[in-house]
């Protein structure tokens, strides 16, 4: 019987099941296209090609009896990471995505990398042949790197796909260890299961009102929870195309992000608050004349403090390009909740009035579906002559 994938969480319990189904039912549909410099189209992956690569990498991992083990994923921006990530899932291996070491200034990235290796105890490193050859010079500075098995997945042949065996993972099987930044303490690994990914993906689809016809453009790094879930998991979950560009391509020329949205008629794209501020400051009036942002339905803003002034400036600046303020979806998320915790659109102008004497009472918050409350929030505000509200999240 043909499955109805309007809501995949009803039909499937793992990401492996979803991708396998799409490879059978939508074999030639392109799911990922890589924009090499943020502009020119490079490689792409159909569901069949992604499934084949995932089975090949999965079979290689199975040959080393890595099922249940942790694997570091050290990749540059590109499609190799996506194939390796799903390859881990196909082998029952827990993926641990991290940015590759900074070879020019190893002291900037090695401490965090070594701390995570010590905590996660990975047995395998998946990477590209280029990164492998360049990283060998760091083995003397970090001996633990040499103790792991390094596999260059860009050398894996498609013939291995025939040797793959279904790992029989379930919704409770761990898919990922998502590590925190480690800016204030040692990085901590958040355990995320297949079920966690599916439930959060279903919630994202409800909050953003996504449909299979939605089109994604992203420049967010895949090792970040927002980039991984919105840029890689969501396209497979909902069966929609995604166009990816290197983060550095956006940072060097922010216009590339909006040009891609305009060119591919993207309906969903976003990033941290600074990305919108960067576009407002760096994109010229002449460049704006070439943009059509009327297709952009969901412009999510999260991963750092969301500033109303930034959104107002962006909306005003790009109104002539067809951008609608109602497209903004401010959101709050964290790795401990897979990604999205709360969010919504700005479809209606809203205002609030407060009685100052009541602001010291605990505010009442409604959690997202299937979210377990572990504490509460307190709202704190200070009277001032300009419309301004500060909020403090306090754990007790």
Feature locations, PLM:
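AMP-dependent adenylate-forming
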Residues: 18-45, 174-177, 184, 333
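Conserved pre-ATP/AMP-binding loop-to-beta segment of ANL
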Residues: 27-30, 150-151, 158-179, 185-186, ...
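Conserved AMP-binding/adenylate-forming core of the ANL superfamily
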Residues: 32-69, 73-86, 103-114, 158, ...
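A short helix-loop-beta submotif of the ANL/AMP-binding
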Residues: 78-103, 115-124, 214-215, 233-243, ...
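Structural core segment of the AMP-binding/adenylate-forming
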Residues: 90-161, 272-273, 278
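Adenylate-forming
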Residues: 124-134, 151-156, 249, 264-316, ...
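Conserved AMP-binding/adenylation subdomain of ANL enzymes
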Residues: 198-215, 222-267, 282-287
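Conserved AMP-binding/adenylate-forming
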Residues: 297-299, 306-331, 335-396
């Amino acid at each position: 019987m043909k499955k109805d994938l309007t809501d995949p969480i009803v039909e499937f319990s793992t990401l492996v099941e979803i991708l396998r189904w799409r490879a059978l039912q939508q074999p030639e549909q392109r799911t990922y296209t890589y924009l090499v410099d943020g502009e020119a189209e490079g490689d792409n992956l159909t569901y069949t090609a992604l499934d084949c690569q995932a089975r090949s990498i999965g079979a290689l991992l199975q040959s080393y009896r890595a099922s249940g083990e942790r694997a570091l994923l050290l990749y540059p921006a590109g499609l190799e990471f996506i194939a390796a990530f799903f390859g881990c899932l196909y082998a029952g291996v827990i993926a641990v995505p991290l940015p590759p070491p900074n070879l020019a200034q190893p002291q900037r990235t090695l401490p965090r990398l070594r701390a995570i290796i010590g905590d996660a105890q990975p047995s395998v490193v998946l990477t590209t042949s280029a990164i492998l050859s360049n990283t060998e010079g760091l083995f003397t500075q970090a001996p633990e790197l040499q103790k792991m098995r390094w596999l260059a997945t860009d050398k894996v042949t498609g013939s291995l796909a025939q040797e793959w065996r279904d790992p029989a993972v379930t919704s409770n099987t761990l898919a990922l260890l998502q590590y925190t930044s480690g800016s204030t303490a040692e990085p901590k690994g958040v355990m995320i299961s297949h079920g966690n990914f599916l439930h959060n993906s279903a919630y994202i689809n409800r909050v953003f009102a996504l449909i299979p016809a939605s089109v994604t453009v992203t420049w967010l790094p895949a090792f970040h929870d927002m980039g991984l879930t919105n840029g890689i998991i969501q396209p497979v979950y909902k069966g929609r195309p995604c166009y990816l560009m290197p983060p550095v391509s956006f940072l060097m020329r922010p216009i590339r992000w909006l040009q891609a949205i305009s060119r591919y008629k993207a309906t969903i794209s976003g990033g941290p608050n600074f990305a919108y501020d960067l576009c407002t400051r760096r994109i010229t009036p002449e460049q704006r004349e070439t943009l059509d942002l009327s297709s952009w339905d969901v412009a999510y803003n999260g991963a750092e403090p969301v500033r109303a002034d930034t959104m107002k400036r962006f909306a005003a600046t790009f109104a002539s390009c067809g951008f609608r303020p109602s497209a903004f979806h401010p959101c709050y998320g964290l790795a401990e909740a897979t990604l999205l915790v709360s969010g919504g659109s700005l479809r209606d102008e809203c205002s609030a009035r407060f009685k100052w004497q009541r602001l010291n009472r605990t505010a009442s918050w409604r959690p997202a579906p299937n979210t377990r409350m572990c504490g509460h929030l307190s709202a704190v505000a200070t009277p001032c002559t300009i419309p301004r509200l500060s909020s403090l999240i306090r754990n007790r």
